[in-house]
Amino acid sequence: MQDNSSHSRESASAGDDPLGIDKLTVDYDYLLYKIRDYVQSIQLDTTELCKKQNEVMVNGIIENTIDKNIAKFKELLEKCDTLENHYEMLNQLAIITDTFKERIAEAVNNYNXLKKGASKSK
């Protein structure tokens, strides 16, 4: 009997693993390592992708907001230009009415002068 127990000790110390449990343990540990490494790789890729997507969204939102603001400012500038044109028209009307008053007064004076001249001729 002692021969059997000493034989099993010698087999174990020699690395003889008839069921392959040691190899299975190493393979299992290696598989866990690969899975963990793969998950970390996916995590890093996902994190990087999410950061890039966030930047795109933030920049896109900012760009859209800026574009909308620029469009609104252009509309305001167009309205200001239109308003300025209306004021120019008012100024032109003021000039026309001022000169119109002068021309009417001159026409009335000329008419009166012609009327006086016609009265003297009779």
Swiss-Prot record:
One of its GO terms (cellular component) is cytoplasm. Residues 1-10 have a biased composition (Basic and acidic residues). InterPro entries: CNL1 (IPR034455). Residues 63-95 form a coiled coil. Keywords: Coiled coil, Cytoplasm, Transport. GO terms for biological process: endosome organization. It comes from the Eukaryota. Residues 1-21 are annotated as: Disordered. It is found in: Cytoplasm. Belongs to the BLOC1S4 family. Component of the biogenesis of lysosome-related organelles complex-1 (BLOC-1) composed of at least BLI1, BLS1, CNL1, KXD1, SNN1 and VAB2. Component of the biogenesis of lysosome-related organelles complex-1 (BLOC-1), a complex that is involved in endosomal cargo sorting. This is Biogenesis of lysosome-related organelles complex 1 subunit CNL1. It comes from Saccharomyces cerevisiae (strain Lalvin QA23).
